[in-house]
Regions:
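Well-ordered beta-sheet/strand-loop patches within structured domains
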Residues: 1-194
Length: 194
C-alpha cells in the first residue's frame, strides 16, 4: 500500500491489483465506467492510466452494464495470476477492433529525501525505497471498424514523484541526540542523521 508517499505493508495491500485487473476487463468489454481513480504513485504491474485504485470510503471502482443483455463476470486466481472474464451477447461487428494505448504526457522527479523514524538505535540508517518518477498520462481508446479508426480519451492520470526514503533509528537515552535526530527527520536532512 501507499502511505504518505511511501510503500508500506498493510492489511489489504495489493487489493488494487484485483480492481486494476477488473478495470481492464471492463474496458475490454466496453462497459460504462462510472468511477475510477489512479494510484497516488505509479504502479509497475500495468501501464499508466490502466490502473484502478480503491480505498475504503475514499475511492472505488464502479461500472455499469450499458449493453442490452445481461453480463456474467468470472474471476479466478491460479498460479500467481488473476483473471477476470466478462461474458455477454456481442452485438457489434465481429471485425471491429478495440485497442487501449497509454500515452505519457509529462514526467516529474522528486528532490531530496524522505526520512522516517524507527525504533532502531540511533545510528541506524536504511534505504527502504528508491526514488519514483512522477508522471501524467492519458489512456486512449482506438476503435477500428469498416476501415475507419476513431480515437477517444478514456481518462487522464497524475502520479506523484517520490524521493528516496530512509528509515532512521531514533532509540536513545540522550535527549539532546533524540531532539537532533527528530529535527533532522522533520526537515528530511540526511546529512544531519549520518
Amino acid at each position: 500500500s501507499y502511505e504518505s508517499g511511501k510503500v508500506v505493508d498493510s492489511y489489504g495491500g495489493g487489493i488494487c491489483q484485483v480492481s486494476t485487473t477488473l478495470y481492464n476487463a471492463v474496458l475490454n468489454a466496453e462497459l460504462e465506467v462510472l468511477e475510477r481513480h489512479n494510484h497516488t504513485m505509479i504502479v509497475t504491474y500495468v501501464d499508466p492510466s490502466k490502473d484502478a485504485a480503491i480505498a475504503e470510503g475514499l475511492m472505488d471502482l464502479r461500472f455499469a452494464n450499458n449493453t442490452d443483455y445481461p453480463i456474467y463476470i468470472s474471476g479466478y486466481a491460479y498460479g500467481g495470476e488473476l483473471t477476470f472474464t466478462i461474458y455477454g451477447h456481442e452485438t457489434r461487428d465481429p471485425n471491429r477492433t478495440v485497442e487501449y494505448v497509454s500515452e505519457t504526457t509529462g514526467t516529474t522527479t522528486a528532490d531530496g529525501v524522505a526520512l522516517y523514524a524507527t525504533d532502531q538505535p540511533v545510528g541506524y540508517l536504511s534505504q527502504t525505497q528508491g526514488a519514483l518518477q512522477g508522471l501524467t498520462a492519458v489512456l486512449w481508446k482506438y476503435v477500428t471498424e469498416n476501415g475507419e479508426t476513431t480515437k477517444e480519451q478514456v481518462n487522464s492520470s497524475t502520479y506523484q514523484a517520490t524521493p528516496v526514503c530512509y528509515d532512521v533509528g531514533v532509540n536513545t537515552d540522550n535527549p539532546t541526540v533524540a531532539a537532533a535526530i527528530q529535527s533532522a527527520i522533520a526537515n528530511n536532512d540526511l546529512d544531519q542523521v549520518q
